[in-house]
């Protein structure tokens, strides 16, 4: 019986020197997505997916760990420079940007793209603890 000879094709990772880091930080979680300029996702990580559960997901340290994990995956694509788009009111915004900077990604610009209503929907009632 003849063996079929199969040529193995390795998937070539494309090189993306410039990328965009989208940091969405809510009151409960932080999501870091690194995309190319067209918006195609290269890597992403969340605080919850990084092993933090419950109230620890919303901490700045959890956001830092998520940003480091996303940066490690993005470095495999050859990312050197990132523009940072920050969205949301959460506590992990600053620490996620610092973590990207510490991973030898040059932060070229930081833009706040938090959506602000022009008096749209009624917000949730204030907490009484």
UniProtKB/Swiss-Prot annotation:
GO terms for molecular function: rRNA binding; structural constituent of ribosome. SUPFAM superfamilies: Translational machinery components (SSF53137). InterPro entries: Ribosomal_uS11 (IPR001971), Ribosomal_uS11_bac-type (IPR019981), Ribosomal_uS11_CS (IPR018102), Ribosomal_uS11_sf (IPR036967). The keyword ATP-binding does not apply. One of its GO terms (cellular component) is ribonucleoprotein complex. It holds the Pfam family Ribosomal_S11. One of its GO terms (biological process) is translation. Keywords: Ribonucleoprotein, Ribosomal protein, RNA-binding, rRNA-binding. Part of the 30S ribosomal subunit. Interacts with proteins S7 and S18. Binds to IF-3. HAMAP family: Ribosomal_uS11 (MF_01310). NCBIfam families: PRK05309.1, uS11_bact. Belongs to the universal ribosomal protein uS11 family. Located on the platform of the 30S subunit, it bridges several disparate RNA helices of the 16S rRNA. Forms part of the Shine-Dalgarno cleft in the 70S ribosome. This is Small ribosomal subunit protein uS11. It comes from Francisella tularensis subsp. holarctica (strain LVS).
